[in-house]
From Swiss-Prot:
Role, per record: Cell wall formation.
Signal sequence region: none
Family in the record: Belongs to the MurB family.
Catalyzed reactions: UDP-N-acetyl-alpha-D-muramate + NADP(+) = UDP-N-acetyl-3-O-(1-carboxyvinyl)-alpha-D-glucosamine + NADPH + H(+)
Name this protein carries in UniProt: UDP-N-acetylenolpyruvoylglucosamine reductase
Stored Pfam families: FAD_binding_4, MurB_C
Known cofactor(s): FAD
InterPro entries per record: FAD-bd_PCMH, FAD-bd_PCMH-like_sf, FAD-bd_PCMH_sub1, FAD-bd_PCMH_sub2, MurB, MurB_C, MurB_C_sf, Oxid_FAD_bind_N
EC number: 1.3.1.98
Residue span, FAD-binding PCMH-type domain: 23-188
GO CC annotations on file: cytosol
Length: 310
């Protein structure tokens, strides 16, 4: 495999497990951390072989399958996490900035409207991509525009309207890497903002298994329903496949109890989908992203294939 000449770092057969919150999954065939946007653009322009590209954020809302990821997995590092202000007074934030870090920056600088980010694991880029939300707010409510690059190496800008936000998603082209996000600035009171952040943290601590190996909410809420209630009603609280289980504390969270495989987690989610559909007639849609190849070894080890709703 002839890789493009870059300033950043390549690693072959790179273990991604330690980068994910679930602590499961296989290796990246090629792992690439660009130095800056120009380095990333150079890689994309030179990618004449059209090597498959996968982008990787904080690893919080993702299952990497046990067979790993083919092609090049791109992770934007600290050089893509800066926070600053535009000439017209908006916030401009690198896509690899953690949601919590932006929430804290806004609290210190008395900027309101970002408190909900303290309750959402992951990065700004990932949050924009899935229109993440919690406690009555979503990214679409605060975003002005994004700066991105497509897989051909072209820099592009999309306004809030052009992004086409929807519940836990958007209508952006699939061959796009978000580089920066620009947000509205509304002044507030630092003490009031901190109080609200503390409320959110307290609520999370009491209702979510935040100290476990988990990936956040497993399923998006169907319109008019709460996923956790449907899962609980189907009798699946605490249900277990191998070392993967449904949280006793919050039924819309899966947990790796120590040695779960990615297949066990994905099988558990698919089984929950099936049982909820049988119980209520409602299909739950995955909120956790599943990427990579299924390992043939995992199929042999697990032994059972479960029916998956199409």
């Amino acid at each position: 495999m002839n890789l493009p000449i870059v300033k950043g770092e390549y690693r072959k057969d790179y273990n991604l497990k330690h980068l994910t919150w679930f602590k499961v999954g296989g290796n990246a065939e090629i792992f690439f951390k660009p130095v800056d946007s120009e380095d990333l653009a150079s890689f994309l322009v030179q990618n004449k072989q059209k090597l498959p590209i996968t982008t990787f954020g904080a690893g919080s809302n993702i299952i990497i399958r046990d067979g790993g990821i083919e092609g090049v997995t791109i992770k934007l590092g600290q050089n893509f996490s800066n926070i600053g202000f535009t000439d017209d007074g908006h916030l401009i934030v690198g896509s690899s900035c953690l949601n919590f870090s932006l929430a804290k920056f806004c609290q210190v600088n008395a900027i309101s409207g970002f408190e909900f980010l303290v309750g959402i694991p992951g990065t700004i880029g990932g949050g924009v991509a899935m229109n993440a939300g919690a406690y009555g707010c979503e990214f679409k409510d605060i975003l002005v525009r994004i700066e991105a690059i497509d897989f051909a190496g072209n820099f592009r800008t999309f306004t809030n309207e052009e992004i086409g936000f929807k519940y836990r998603g958007n209508n952006l082209p699939k061959d796009l890497i978000i580089l920066k996000a620009v947000f509205k600035v509304n002044k507030g009171n630092s003490e009031d903002i901190l109080a609200r952040m503390n409320e959110i943290n307290a609520a999370r601590s009491s209702t979510q298994p935040i100290k476990e190996r988990t990936g956040g909410s497993t399923f998006a809420n169907p319109e008019g329903f709460k996923s956790w209630q449907l899962i609980d009603k189907a009798g699946l609280r605490g249900y277990r496949i191998g070392d993967a289980s449904i949280s006793e504390l919050h039924c819309n969270f899966m947990i790796n109890n120590g040695n779960a495989t990615a297949k066990e987690l994905e099988d558990l989610g698919n089984f929950v989908q099936q049982k909820v559909f049988e119980d209520s007639g409602i299909k739950l849609n995955w909120e956790i992203k599943r990427i990579g190849k299924v390992s043939s070894r995992a199929w042999l080890d697990h032994g059972i294939q479960r029916k998956i709703i199409k």
